[in-house]
Amino acid sequence: MTKTSTCIYHFLVLSWYTFLNYYISQEGKDEVKPKILANGARWKYMTLLNLLLQTIFYGVTCLDDVLKRTKGGKDIKFLTAFRDLLFTTLAFPVSTFVFLAFWILFLYNRDLIYPKVLDTVIPVWLNHAMHTFIFPITLAEVVLRPHSYPSKKTGLTLLAAASIAYISRILWLYFETGTWVYPVFAKLSLLGLAAFFSLSYVFIASIYLLGEKLNHWKWGDMRQPRKKRK
């Protein structure tokens, strides 16, 4: 049975992410902000895509919580499996990647990722909501509830597919507009871009494996059992 406190926590997190998405959508209507959201609108930034991803995940999680309390676990195995797959392959790796990549680049040279002019446009609290608080929230999910991991091949393949899709969008936007989503890309040669994207995947794949280790450390082996061949 899902604990009431965990259900309440999931609902509060869902409300928080829903509020952030709504607030940012309203901010985009301000006359000062269209330049930031132009050429691909909100969906060119991994930060904002991550907020949407977390909202979807916690929406699924809340639905799973409610149905478990009303119907029991047997009737919603598919939903629980989807919840776990979404968290293990996307929600945890992406939010942790956004947190680490943003602050590493910010501390090295903020102009590569978040130019100072954005301080006059984006409130400090919103910056931290998008880039800082996402990590303790996703880490809390690891601690509060066990998640069944797929095989490494399946998990890393799904993560690679999502990474390729996002990189393809970045490149498409550049060829369409002549402007890079993030300033750091303008500093790199073609070879440098290839290396950056490759290392980014290695980084996020390492985060995926770390999530699996943390889950195993806290809850034991939760990997999905392999189907026996007939």
UniProtKB/Swiss-Prot annotation:
Per the record, what are the reactions this protein catalyses? 9-hexadecanoyloxy-octadecanoate + H2O = 9-hydroxy-octadecanoate + hexadecanoate + H(+); 12-hexadecanoyloxy-octadecanoate + H2O = 12-hydroxyoctadecanoate + hexadecanoate + H(+); 9-(9Z-hexadecenoyloxy)-octadecanoate + H2O = (9Z)-hexadecenoate + 9-hydroxy-octadecanoate + H(+); 12-(9Z-hexadecenoyloxy)-octadecanoate + H2O = 12-hydroxyoctadecanoate + (9Z)-hexadecenoate + H(+)
Q: Which residues cross the membrane?
A: 4-24, 47-67, 86-106, 120-140, 155-175, 190-210
The EC code for this enzyme is 3.1.-.-
Residue ranges annotated as Cytoplasmic topological domain: 1-3, 68-85, 141-154, 211-230
Q: Which InterPro entries match?
A: ADTRP_AIG1
The principal location of this protein is membrane
Ordered alphabetically, the record's keywords are:
Cell membrane, Hydrolase, Lipid metabolism, Membrane, Transmembrane, Transmembrane helix
Please describe the organ and tissue distribution of this protein's expression.
Expressed in cultured endothelial cells and in placenta.
What is the enzyme's class at the highest EC level? Answer: hydrolase
**A matching Pfam family:** Far-17a_AIG1
Q: What does this protein do?
A: Hydrolyzes bioactive fatty-acid esters of hydroxy-fatty acids (FAHFAs), but not other major classes of lipids. Show a preference for FAHFAs with branching distal from the carboxylate head group of the lipids. Regulates the expression and the cell-associated anticoagulant activity of the inhibitor TFPI in endothelial cells (in vitro).
Record protein name field: Androgen-dependent TFPI-regulating protein
Q: Which species is listed as the source?
A: Homo sapiens (Human)
Q: Which gene encodes it?
A: ADTRP
